[in-house]
Amino acid sequence: MPQMIVNPLDRFRMTSALATPRIIAASVGGPGAGKSRFWMTAPEPIVFQSLDWGMEGVVDKFQEDFAEANGRLKQIRVRDYDWAPTAEDEKQDGFQQEAVKMRNTFIVDFLIACEHARTVVWDKETDVWNLFRYAEFGKPKGDQARDFDKANQLMRKYINHPKKLTINFGLIQDVKDEWVSQNKKSGAVQRAGFREVPGLVHVDLWHDRREGKFFTLVGKARGAGAADVQDKEFENFTVPTLGMALFPETDVSDWK
């Protein structure tokens, strides 16, 4: 019997010229900048995991417009998490255990959403990162002298999870003031949340509202058409518009 020849490199996956047409992106911006509405334009079913309870007045208006144009509601589902700890909450016995319980529930919901939805959105990732820190370290600043490795690893694990699949994943991030010294603001803002997010996502988006109009600045981007959108600002941007720009071989039907 002839001996089978095994290529030692078969243990490594051969790459392909075909990219998976999906969006894994951070959406950064202040309140009312259109971040959530942008992700409502993504392929359905969509699941929002919301820790900021900011969907009221946004999703209902979107659904009203969508139903008028399509004769039905879009499959947008939301789970709200009651996570807004106060200084008094932090003093209560068992507070950290409550944070652990909520984090674990959030993770289970996330994995289920990833399995059954086409788009999953963390609204906001800024709050998810705070929840993970509370669960790991307790009250704020209890982590200053701690080892961040475990919390970092958990965030990396779940942010990277959708990359094994073909779903779209949005991480909405808030902004915070940039300080040049302890008592002086620079006047600029910076993203608030897990600091590794820009390196983990495929696309980095900055949202703004000016004179009642919504604008999206595309930063880092991956895809065959990335050069056509990087470092450019677009008005009333949508996920399908971004998707078709990054993956020119797709059309609008691929992003419904």
List each language-model region with its residue ranges.
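C-terminal regions of RecA-like/P-loop NTPase motor modules
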Residues: 1-10, 19-23, 212-256
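Conserved P-loop
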Residues: 7-9, 19-115
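Glycine-rich, phosphate-binding/catalytic loops in enzymes
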Residues: 44, 65, 136-141, 187
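Residue-level signature of catalytic and energy-coupling elements of molecular machines
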Residues: 48, 123, 201
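A short beta-strand-to-loop transition that corresponds to the Sensor-1 phosphate-sensing loop
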Residues: 52, 123-124, 171-176
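Short acidic, S/G/P-rich loop/turn micro-motifs used as interaction or catalytic elements
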Residues: 54-55, 127-129, 177-178
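Phosphate-binding/switch loop-helix module in NTP-utilizing enzymes
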Residues: 88-165
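Phosphate-binding/switch region of NTP-binding enzymes
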Residues: 161-241
